[in-house]
């Protein structure tokens, strides 16, 4: 099923909610059960967050709610109201985030489909733990799937970004 067809299965229920996405307040009309993913992609036209499985199993749709990584396909827009939502478009605050720079340096992208979810998941790790071990990286990234199997590159990019972020913060 195409993404737009899936969104159309969620009616606009006459419920106006305010979402704070990437620092901007946005009003949307949505049914109570509409996943945040579809509001982000279809109503707000921010397509960096991807639809992967629709069941919260692959991680392609990962965004941050109040700094915590969540699967936007399993989070209703209504539940996200009143929280700070960050998508891949807002991660670097208008500039490339250290993870995005490291992703390119380590040549992580292949098909790129998992990329935004992987980066958002990794960013939540580095926000809590600026110097993770390989085991901590593997454990935190478990559940974010990459069909191109670039897991080694993903891990190296996270280590590189962490080192870059620590050097810039003086840690």
List each model region and its residues.
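Signature of N-terminal electron-transfer/Fe-S-associated modules in redox systems
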Residues: 6-171
